[in-house]
Amino acid sequence: MEPHPASRQTPAWFWFAALFALILLSRLPFIGVEYGQEFDAWRVARAAQHIAETGEYETSRAPGNPVQEIVCSWIWRGGPWAINGASAFFSAIAATALAAVARRMGCAHWWLAALAFAAVPVVFLGSVNGKDYLWSLAFVMLSICAALRARPVSAGVLLGLAIGCRITAAAMILPLGVMLLGALPRAARIGGIARLVLATFAAGLAAFSPVLLRYGFGALTFYENLGRPTWKAAVTLGTLDVFGALGLLGMLIAVGGGCFRLLRRDPLPILQNALLTPALALMAAIYLAAYVRLPHQAGYLIPFVAAVILLAARWSPRPAFLACAGCLLVAPFVSISRDGLGAGCIFADHAQRVQNTASLRRFLEFAESLPGHNAIVVGAWEPQIAVLAPELLHGHNDYFYTLDEKELAPLLRAGRPVWFMPEIREFNLRVNRLDLAHYGARDLRLAR
């Protein structure tokens, strides 16, 4: 199947550049308000500032995402516009690389596949905050492009950079290996796979060297116990929070169309790489299984979304895929609920960021008015305080993310009043196995 008709008159690079610019521009109205609702995004900003000011590497959270943290340390003075803007930049790279893969698969609407992917709510939201999801995926998609061109060393280096942004990208070594098997002649397959593995290991090790030199290999096994949501919550997080109601409808249309096509046994364009479709299915299965194991954040499924969009572009009949893409393009801007149509997730996220910052400033005004030198456990607000008001973090009061026994004991010996936010008591118990109230800490509501 030929590319989009317009590309017959205009070089392909022009359409890729236009696609990149369009996706990047669509993010700009939403990147200037703080670093996002997820506190890990604030941790990235905090670590970037520390690295820039001290020259010493500090992870935002174990096991770290050193490529993102170090690059952000070069631009952190630009605030949300710079750090969120970098996420937007990498989201445009990821979508453009996805378009290149779709085009190589013979998809007539490869450009629409990229736009649909970029509009998936979880992707759009991830591209306007400080999280690492789209940084990693950009390098993953570029590594796929390299593998399809039978360039195992380039694919491995790019995958190593993806791992340096998000360690879970290491799982892509299997799908990339399958793609290389289909791209290389039989005699070159063993050597190609070996070069892929060695290049990935070398690049990944180099990317993670700041973490290993500072914290040792123990940092790679760290896991913060956030608890497991109910299955109902996990399903909602993995469906509606990923695609939105309209986007989920679109994906169901695409799946239905693909099943109908299989039943009719309609012919598909012959792929240059016969193993590309199985490799994408493997990619989707790996990241879906990883999410099922730890269903904490919808963003974990972003690589799954990329694979599924490509499979839909390949297998769905043209009307079904156009309907799917249309639903996805609208999904971040319009929501559907029992109350009817409403503002989409991207507008709700923007408003919630403004509200969260206002709430934090009101809280700090109250907390700083308390008498004495207090220790206050604030959970996710701790990195936000460190970024927005670093002079207050250890000033009149000390603000902590959580407290363990070693941290709590000297506070109690010094006679310091210890307070906790209402929802933090249970969180601290789950993470540190320590009930703050049992040791004399008090609910901050009692101070009002």
Predicted regions and their residues:
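Membrane-embedded, lumen/periplasm-facing catalytic core of multi-pass transferases
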Residues: 52, 327-392, 396-400, 404
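Loop-to-helix entry region of an early transmembrane alpha helix in multi-pass inner-membrane enzymes
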Residues: 62-66, 70, 77-96, 126-129
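Signature aromatic-anchored transmembrane alpha helix within multi-pass, membrane-resident enzymes
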Residues: 5, 12-21, 157, 197-205, ...
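Hydrophobic/aromatic-rich transmembrane helices and adjacent perimembrane loops
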Residues: 162-165, 171-174, 293-319
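Transmembrane-helix motifs of polytopic, lipid-linked glycan transferases
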Residues: 21, 81, 85-107, 142, ...
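Short acidic/glycine- and proline-prone juxtamembrane loop motifs at membrane-interface regions
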Residues: 128-133, 297-298
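Membrane-lumen/periplasm interface segments of specific transmembrane helices
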Residues: 192-257, 288, 292, 331-335
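Transmembrane signal-anchor helices characteristic of membrane glycosylation enzymes that use polyprenol
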Residues: 11-41, 201-215, 288-289, 330-335
